[in-house]
Each structure stands twice: as C-alpha cells, then as structure tokens.
C-alpha cells in the first residue's frame, strides 16, 4: 500500500488542475469560435430549436422550457445558463440582428428580466434561419460534426453562418485569464468590408461600432483598434434638450450597450439626494418597448447643458469600453485584427460552399444514374416483361431478380 502513494507538490498540482479547468471553460463555454462567431451555448440553442424541436417559425414555436431541456443534452451547464443565453439572442437592444424570437416578455430596455421559461415561447427568427442555420437546412455535410459530451449524440462544430455574426451582434464574456469584448457593428458596414476584402484582400479595413441603441462614439482611433483587434473607446448615450410649454427637460434616448435605464434612474436619484443635481425638478420614464425616453424635468432657469455634462460625468450614460477580438481557432485562442477575422470568415464560407456544391453534384450524379436506368428500360423493348418481374418480386428470390435485371439491362448494383 505504501508503494502506491505518490508524493506531489500541492501548489504545483493546484496550478495544473486550475490550468486544465480554465482551458475546459474557455473552449467549451466562453470563447466564440472563429468560424461562426458563436459561443457553444448559442450554437447549441439553435441546433436544439432547428434539429430537435423544429421551431423555425411562429407557427412552430415551442415553450422556452422545452428548448432549455432539449439543449441540456448538448450543453450540461444548467437551466439558468442556457435560458440566460437566450435573452440577448432575442432582444433588439442586445443584438443588432436577433437570432431567435420570443412571443412574450423577453426583458426590457429598462433592464427588466425575462419571464420564466415555462411562460415564454420562442422560435428561430427569419434572420437566424437564413444567416445562421443557412445551408444546414439542405444538408448536414456543409460543416464538421463531433460527439456530444457523453458520446450519445452528435452536434456541429460550427454553423454555416452567411455573415460575420461575431462583428454584427458582438459578444461579451469573462473567463479565467481572458476577457472577450466585441461591440456590435452595422450590418451594412460589415458586409461592405467583407465584400471589399473578397475583391481585394490587400485592402485596409476600418470599422466603427454601431451600438444597439444608437449611441455616440467619442474621440477614438478606430484605425488603430481595427488593425490590432484591441483597444479602448468611449461611448455615451443620446441626451436631447427639449423645450415645452412648462419649460425645459432632458430626454435620455439611448444608453450604452449593457447599461440599463433603471440603473441610470437610481443613480440620478442618488445624485439629487447628494445635492449634485439641484437643478432637477422631477424624473419620469416615458419609455416604450421600442424607444427609451427618460425625461429629466429642470427647474426654472436651470442650465440644461450643465446638467447634461453632470449626467455624463457621474452616471453610466458615458462609459469607457474595450475591444478585445479573441476567438477560438481549433484549440488555440487568438487575438485578430478586423481584417484578419474577415479574411478567415471568407475562407470558411468558401469551404462551406465547396461542401454544398459537392453534395449537390453527388445528388445530381445519383439522380442521373437513376434516369439512365429508366432510359435503358425504355430502350430494351421489353418493358412489359420487366414491369411484370418487378411487380411479382415478392414471389421470387430477390437475388435472382437483381441478377436478372443487371444482365437484362446491363446496369450496376446502385441502379
């Protein structure tokens, strides 16, 4: 028994164990794949909805709890992790182009939570079907497949996305030793940049984020950030000064991504109590599901521009964010420039199209082989006898019938 005891340094063993755990977390949960720009949980939600539940339109929507339960066979990390990932995939104020659609409460621009999964129903959005599922609706052969965590099922390693989703919808995740933070960008800008590189790979690319709620980007060197895939930038919400019959008020029309209006209101109330906003008379929320409208009514004679600057300085209406374009390429985490990422995306699309056209070619060749059989039957001059033999195949040996047809028509086993 004594000989089976191995002496190890607990500190070194802890380091090795943490390193293995951190790699597992990075590869299986947090870092988006370079090919489709999706994190594993996002991909698995779409796979569950498309393959298992077939909820691909409003007429085939299913309870979100059913989607979460089905996704567990691909993503064994708990209900909350899966359902929490569905929320930003469905909201216009968290994704530029939502991949799924809810038929009821999926959160709000104020920062409200989504309804319980047993109440909401969801399905893949039209954009999700066209640009994320893409060619998978025709054949599974367009992407590589791998075993699930328990080796009981298969799942795609990536989806055949038609547009660079990673740049369009952005992503944010914090894991051990890394922080992936990619802002949303305009669909038109990203497509224009991609087409430019398609026609001229030596072109220089500069992309500027386009916040979901149309905020203002302040004093940033986007040429440098685009070339490095890394850097800081300042973004601030839109505040309009409005005059009405009662005086002036400030209308907050947008907040930076992942900054919620409820938190802004709480901070403003705190500033009022601290006498840092003594010129404010009242705060009211006139927001709708489609438009944020926080109104800050000012006292008579107040300086609206001064109050505006106080809000930017003391609340999250103006924040500094980071770009860190890190992706999982095979088993390696890489930081890429915008151009490098788009060039890789184009290569991935070429591979998807090659596989698709190869599938279509094989399908056409098989069909041609079948048609050739019909032609030989017509040219044989003995159609009635051949049809009689086929109709009465139940009463004769199958091997004899196949051998007779092959000799009679000079056809192959496949035909």
Which residues are covered by each model-predicted region?
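Flexible hinge/switch segments at interdomain interfaces of large molecular machines
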Residues: 1, 18-20, 59-63, 97-103, ...
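Catalytic phosphate-handling regions of large nucleic-acid enzymes and associated NTPases
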Residues: 1-229, 293-295
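Long, charged, helix-rich clamp/arm modules that form nucleic acid-engaging surfaces
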Residues: 1-11, 18, 23-31, 51-55, ...
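Short amphipathic beta-strand starts and helix->beta connectors
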Residues: 160-161, 230-240, 272-282, 370-372
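Short helix/loop capping segments that flank catalytic or ligand/cofactor-binding pockets
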Residues: 176, 183-185, 261-263, 304-306
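Hydrophobic side chains in well-ordered alpha-helices
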Residues: 190, 264-267, 307
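Extended, compositionally biased intrinsically disordered regions at domain boundaries
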Residues: 191-249, 262, 271, 352, ...
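Long hydrophobic segments that form regular secondary structure
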Residues: 242-283
């Amino acid at each position: 028994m004594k000989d089976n005891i191995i002496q190890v340094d607990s500190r070194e063993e802890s380091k090795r164990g943490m390193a293995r755990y951190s790699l597992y977390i990075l590869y299986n949960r947090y870092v988006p794949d370079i090919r489709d720009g999706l994190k594993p949980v996002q991909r698995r939600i779409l796979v569950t909805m498309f393959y298992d539940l077939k909820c691909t339109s409003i007429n085939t929507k299913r309870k979100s709890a059913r989607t979460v339960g089905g996704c567990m066979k691909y993503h064994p990390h708990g209900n909350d992790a899966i359902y929490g990932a569905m929320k930003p995939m469905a909201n216009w104020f968290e994704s530029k182009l939502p991949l799924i659609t809810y038929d009821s409460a999926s959160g709000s621009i104020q920062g409200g939570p989504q309804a319980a999964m047993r109440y909401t129903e969801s399905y893949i959005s039209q954009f999700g079907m066209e640009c994320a599922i893409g060619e998978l609706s025709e054949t599974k052969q367009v992407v590589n497949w791998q075993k699930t965590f328990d080796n009981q099922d298969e799942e795609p390693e990536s989806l055949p996305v038609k547009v660079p989703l990673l740049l369009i919808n952005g992503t944010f995740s914090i894991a051990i030793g890394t922080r992936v933070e990619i802002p949303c960008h305009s669909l038109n800008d990203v497509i224009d940049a991609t087409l430019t590189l398609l026609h001229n790979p030596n072109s220089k690319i500069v992309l500027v984020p386009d916040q979901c709620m149309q905020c203002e980007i302040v004093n940033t060197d986007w040429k440098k950030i685009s070339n490095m895939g890394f850097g800081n930038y300042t973004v601030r919400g839109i505040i309009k000064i409005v005059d009405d019959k009662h005086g002036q008020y400030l209308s907050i029309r947008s907040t930076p991504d992942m900054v919620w209006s409820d938190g802004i209101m709480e901070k403003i109330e705190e500033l009022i109590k601290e006498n840092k906003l003594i010129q404010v008379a009242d705060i009211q929320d006139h927001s709708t599901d489609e438009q944020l409208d926080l109104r800050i009514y000012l006292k008579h004679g107040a300086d609206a521009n001064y109050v505006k600057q106080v809000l930017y300085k003391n609340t999250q209406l103006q924040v500094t964010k980071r770009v860190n374009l890190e992706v999982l390429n095979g088993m390696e985490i890489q930081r890429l420039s915008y151009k490098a990422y788009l060039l890789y995306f184009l290569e991935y699309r070429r591979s998807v199209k090659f596989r698709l056209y190869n599938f279509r070619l094989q399908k056409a060749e098989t069909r041609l082989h079948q048609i050739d059989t019909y032609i030989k039957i017509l040219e044989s001059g003995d159609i009635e006898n051949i049809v009689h033999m086929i109709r009465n195949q139940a009463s004769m040996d199958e091997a004899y019938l196949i051998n007779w047809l092959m000799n009679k028509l000079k056809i192959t086993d496949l035909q």
